[in-house]
Amino acid sequence: MIGVFVIALVLVTPSAAWMRKLDRIAGALQELRDAGVVVLFSPMQEMNGVWFWWGIDSHRTDPEPYIRVYRAMHDFFNKEKGLDNLIWVYSPTSTYGNETVTNYVFRAVDWAYPGDNYVDIIAGTNYADDMSISDYPTYIKMGKPLGNAGFGPSSDGPFLKNGTWDLSRIIERIKKDYPRIAFWESWHSYPGSSWSMISNLNADILLADPFVINRDDLPWNIK
């Protein structure tokens, strides 16, 4: 019930605590702006799942509360704080083919989309042993540049525990089936799990592929 309370009331009379949080975030982002750093910013991601307070448990039949909070945050950072170094990333969780309104865990990836004027890039998260992105056709229809904001082996598959997920297959899958994916972000490992690239097989092969641009290949001009 905490989630229901927070998402429903956060914008009714914006609380001092909420605004202090946004101010602190804005302060850090301003430092990056002043240093010439552009930020891929994906606030309140995986909103179409149940595990965060801003997720569907707080508004099961209506995405409007999430959309209002996202838009208000966007306007606060962009207009009031002048943070023109932010690239806004809409980052839902993959539905893994379970995007029905009656499903307890997921809503469709575009269910809480805040609108084209509030999103620059769409980059969902996706954890699948076969490296499939079931929502890719929907992402294409949404008409924005695409990325993958979190990937790794399935949470209930064999690779998560033993670190034998073959990363060399990722780039081949992207080339063949998901060519609009422009970047990806690996999740980290923690005790008992092997999510990260370095914890699995053939990360060096993946990063050495000519299709991949690494950090050292980029023309950094930050002063």
State where each predicted segment sits.
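Substrate-binding cleft of extracellular glycoside hydrolase catalytic domains
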Residues: 1-3, 8-83
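The substrate-binding groove and active-site-proximal loops of carbohydrate-active enzymes
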Residues: 8-19, 59-63, 120-128, 152-160
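Long, well-ordered alpha-helical scaffolding segments within enzyme catalytic domains
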Residues: 21-27, 61-81, 134-149, 159-177
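Alpha-helical scaffolding within the catalytic cores
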Residues: 24-28, 92-113, 128-139, 164-173
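Loop/turn elements at helix/coil->beta-strand transitions in domains of secreted/extracellular proteins
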Residues: 34-40, 79-88, 117-121, 141-147, ...
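Aromatic-lined carbohydrate-recognition surfaces of secreted/lumenal glycan-active proteins
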Residues: 42-44, 70-107, 146-154, 186
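Glycoside hydrolase catalytic-domain groove-lining segments
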Residues: 106, 112-158, 196-214
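Substrate-binding cleft of secreted/luminal carbohydrate-active enzymes
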Residues: 147-223
